[in-house]
């Protein structure tokens, strides 16, 4: 059963995003600066659109934190939208004079749904005659709220169990980084300084070249990010039920990120292409205890963490707002048309890695809280240490 609960609210061009996280113990260190640092990382990446140049994330804690520490009550955080004054009437919660709205270009009905977005299916489901009410919430801007909560979860994981999380881009379009080269937490600063957050210099150059070409072609690109969690204790999750398996929870969380269309744990789909003798991680005795000689499983077996490096990948499709504009139908007229286009990224794969880090952090934080409990960080930390010290099989 989940110990933590989280929820976000807000629209892309609304006054703010808000998020709540319930179930954390007292004593987790967190400040607005810590959250702002991760939100700034979310704006990184070569190929981002103009919005990243002027978008600023104003972080305010509304509850659950006092003097830099959680209090054991629900944590509420707000990420303000500095562009709100431009949208105050278009996105107002209260009714606005129709004559005022009619004179606003930003309020023009969006009746040409974009292929690859939630536009058309959302309009059909909720009965809207234009896409604005759908795209405002479906926008990847919402991930800023999840990154904010992820910052809190990361602090909890590090303080209680010593878990640290890092991500990198392993594929962007046809450019690929060498397989099996895994960054550590010590590489984060170097990764964030790279234009595409890739550890391999040659692969990074190839990825930048792919983005440049796509920009010239009026196109967009997807890719694959890999998230690694170091220090994850053995035994998180469960083999008992499908919804308690940790890899299932990780996959669901990552698939919930906008534009993610595939997830694999460890070597994932590659394991389907090799015989069993080459697919599994053999177990050996070492001076440090019983270990696995490889990491093909990605640190989970049977829905449980193994104590080895946790490794997951997420595949992001190309951004659906394509500059060259794809074919669609204008729902107001029924005529063939080109899809609505606004400023967009050529690629947001590097940023997807930061969002994926946050989601992995939230899932692992939930699993740690579920396994070890505790009303304070001190109590949880003590429970973790006691568990690890008293494992019957090491």
Swiss-Prot record:
InterPro entries in alphabetical order: Chorismate_synth, Chorismate_synth_AroC_sf, Chorismate_synthase_CS
A single cellular component GO annotation: cytosol
Keywords assigned: Amino-acid biosynthesis, Aromatic amino acid biosynthesis, FAD, Flavoprotein, FMN, Lyase, NADP
Highest taxon in the source lineage: Bacteria
Annotated GO biological process: amino acid biosynthetic process; aromatic amino acid family biosynthetic process; chorismate biosynthetic process
Pathway as given in its UniProt record: Metabolic intermediate biosynthesis; chorismate biosynthesis; chorismate from D-erythrose 4-phosphate and phosphoenolpyruvate: step 7/7
Pfam families: Chorismate_synt (PF01264)
Keyword presence, NADP: yes
Reaction it catalyzes: 5-O-(1-carboxyvinyl)-3-phosphoshikimate = chorismate + phosphate
Function: This reaction introduces a second double bond into the aromatic ring system.
Family, per entry: Belongs to the chorismate synthase family.
NCBIfam families: aroC, PRK05382.1
Complex formation: Homotetramer.
Protein name: Chorismate synthase
Upper classification of the organism: Bacteria, Bacillati, Actinomycetota, Actinomycetes, Kitasatosporales
């Amino acid at each position: 059963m989940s110990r933590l609960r989280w929820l976000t609210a807000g629209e892309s061009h609304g006054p703010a995003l808000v998020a709540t996280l319930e179930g954390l113990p007292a004593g987790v260190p967190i400040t607005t600066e810590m959250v702002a640092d991760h939100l700034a990382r979310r704006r990184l990446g070569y190929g981002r659109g103009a919005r990243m140049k002027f978008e600023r994330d104003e972080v305010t804690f509304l509850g659950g934190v006092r003097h830099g520490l959680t209090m054991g009550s629900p944590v509420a955080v707000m990420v303000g939208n500095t562009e709100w004054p431009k949208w105050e009437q278009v996105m107002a919660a209260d009714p606005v004079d129709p004559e005022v709205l009619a004179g606003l270009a930003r309020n023009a009905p969006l009746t040409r749904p974009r292929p690859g977005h939630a536009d058309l299916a959302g309009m059909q489901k909720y009965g809207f005659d234009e896409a604005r009410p759908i795209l405002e919430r479906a926008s990847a801007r919402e991930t800023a709220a999840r990154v904010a909560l992820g910052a809190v979860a990361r602090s909890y994981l590090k303080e209680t169990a010593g878990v640290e999380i890092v991500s990198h881009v392993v594929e962007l379009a046809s450019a690929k980084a060498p397989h099996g080269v895994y960054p550590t937490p010590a590489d984060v600063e170097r990764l964030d300084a790279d234009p595409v957050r890739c550890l391999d210099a040659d692969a990074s150059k190839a990825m930048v070249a792919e983005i440049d070409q796509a920009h010239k072609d009026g196109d967009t690109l997807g890719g694959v990010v890999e998230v690694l969690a170091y220090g994850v204790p053995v035994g998180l999750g469960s083999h008992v039920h499908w919804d308690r398996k940790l890899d299932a929870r990780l996959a669901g969380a990552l698939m919930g990120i906008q534009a993610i269309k595939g997830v694999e744990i460890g070597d994932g789909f590659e394991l389907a292409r090799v015989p069993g003798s080459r697919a599994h991680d053999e177990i050996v005795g070492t001076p440090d205890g019983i270990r696995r000689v490889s990491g093909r499983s990605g640190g989970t077996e049977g829905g449980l963490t193994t104590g080895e490096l946790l490794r997951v990948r997420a595949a992001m499709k190309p951004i659906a707002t394509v500059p060259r504009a794809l074919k669609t139908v204008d729902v107001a007229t029924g005529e063939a048309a080109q899809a609505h286009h606004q400023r967009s990224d050529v690629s947001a794969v590097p940023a997807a890695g930061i969002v994926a880090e946050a989601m992995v952090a939230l899932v692992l934080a939930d699993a740690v809280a579920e396994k070890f409990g505790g009303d304070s960080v001190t109590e949880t930390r003590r429970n973790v240490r006691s568990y690890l010290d008293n494992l019957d099989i090491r």
